[in-house]
Amino acid sequence: MSALIKVLVVDDHELVRTGITRMLADIPDIRVVGESASGEEALSLVRQVAPDVVLMDVRMPGMGGLEATRKLLRQNSALRIVAVTICDEDPFPARLLQAGAAGYLTKGACLEEMVRAIRQAADGQRYLSPEVAQRLALRAFDGDVAQSPFDQLSEREMQVTLMIVHGERIQDISDKLCLSPKTVNTYRYRIFEKLGVEGDVQLALLAVKHGLSGVNAG
């Protein structure tokens, strides 16, 4: 019999956590040992439940998946983290892999693919969903990774950027990211300065040019 793989599910949406837990309940060599609604909570919970693999949502209010991945791996370098995103056009795969993530899945992945990713991660291998692997390969081939001005943005700046591009108001962004409107505006002007744009319209046009306009912000 295969060794039991202990999994922690980290996602700010309860329905997603519950759905993943139920999907994995009938897999004999995998056991969900905990659920966390935030990156901050995951840092504490990992110490308590000692998972082998963490399924990590990429975008969450507060500490996002990228920052949580970095901190968890500093806390325990043997931990295996599989990032999960709602969209295969996400701008973060390369960053998360560089941060030490063992895999990258989309939330549209079937049960078989999720199980494969968990098992490969637990076995010390890496797993990328076919869509993400293809996109990374194409970007590397075309040289887009080095050329994209968005690569200089932090994870939080990227979150704010995507929300602005999708037409969300400052107050909406503030509420979703648990930040004050003043802080959101600070991020906004910092983004403008880094990207060399003068407003939301120019930012949106730049996002379209670099293929980010269809990326889901949350």
Where are these regions (language model features)?
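Active-site beta3 strand of CheY-like receiver
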Residues: 49-55
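Helix-turn-helix DNA-binding segment
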Residues: 146-182
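Short amphipathic alpha-helix used as the core "switch/output" element in two-component signaling
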Residues: 44, 66-78
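Short, flexible helix-to-coil linker/hinge segments that flank and couple to helix-turn-helix
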Residues: 91-98, 103-159, 201-202, 209-214
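Conserved acidic segment of CheY-like receiver
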Residues: 3-16, 20-24, 153
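Active-site residues of response regulator receiver
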Residues: 57, 85
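Acidic catalytic/metal-coordinating carboxylates
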Residues: 38-41, 61-67, 88
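Recognition helix of helix-turn-helix DNA-binding domains
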Residues: 169-202
